[in-house]
Amino acid sequence: MPPRRSTTLAGTAAAGCLLLLTACGHGPAHAAKDAAPTPVGAAEAPAPLPVPRGGGSEVPDDFNGDGHRDLVLDTLVTAESHADDAGIGIVYGSSRGLVPGARQLLTPEKYAAPVGGRPPAVFEAEASCDLDGDGFTDLVVTTDPPYDGRGRPPVPLQLLFGSPSGPAGRAVPLVVPDRARYGNDWPERPVCGDFDGDGAADLVLHASTGRLSHLRGPFTRKGAPREAGPPVPSAGEAPTGPAADVNHDGYDDLVVRASAGPGGATLVLGGPDGPTRTGVTLPAGDDVALGAFGRGKALDAAVGSPGGIAMRYDLPTAARGSLGTPGSMLDAADFDGDGLSELVSSGSGVRVHPGRAAGPTARGAVAVRPATTGTTRVLAAGDFDGDGLADLVLRTHRGDTQDTVEVHRGSAEDLVTARAAVTFSTSQFLAP
């Protein structure tokens, strides 16, 4: 049986994660014009503020239901090198964007269900969606339950339910019925989506090589799905989110990678019975991204690798194309509001490549240069201020004890602003 694996929240900077609404390109890049308001610096970050209370919404990643997108921070700096981080951080959104003072720290001691009679040593965000349909986004986390290597391992996933004040109370273990399991692998790698088209969020998990578990929502507050059938066949073993309805048939679809690392991938189509149909086999690569790149009516796929990016247009038809730019890490969203996807490629640098009606292009690519030095990764690409334009959130870290998070606003003219509108450090979560 393979060893326990640790994964991160889908839609972040980890290589191999699938990100919705993506374009890609390569070529001369210019810095965007500075159209952002005066930044909120890390040193001037406000004191902790109460989490705004909401009444429920359909906005993604809205844990307090106030109609504004929130930011999940799965990696926080530590007071000393090599120390365990404090937990999972949430920075809450507003009509002005993210508010660093409105924050919440989810510690395993306070929020995790005990494993083996004690708080789990592992407590990491994996996926987020409204699993119980109450208008508040819920968080799927992974833990490290004890396992002696004999028989089926326990389910490591737990559900933290949102509320008017954000995630509240302890998480509950996710219930994966025996009939939905196959083999002796860890049930892991959760992907949210409405795969059966009934309007409720489901979860797809890895069951074993060649099998997926499909848990139909809505979920109870005890962590149980409405229904779960036998595992469904799959061409791979690593379901990858976020899901998307690529062919606009009312059923979410997802990419399943052959393994957790670089390699091949398959687009699996949803339907009344869930994600049971193979749509198209994608080329091997490091990362896969879905987006409205401009060709055809359906979504397209970009498959990134150090040697270039393979394009597959109008899925599942998958007309072929290519871009001669490295793309080992891909993130995406519509930053200029034209309805087409921009691609963010990161690794050695961060570039935003504009989408065009004929497909993604290298012309007019924007280089986003963080204000601080270090290792930079994309945390999120989404609309955090409600203006209809996606924003780009970057984290630059220098070792384990220093980092800076920057929010670059989307721009109809420049794709994203060169200067960050908001900056802060995750060290704010260390404060008592």
Residue positions per predicted region:
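Beta-propeller-forming repeat regions
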Residues: P2-P432
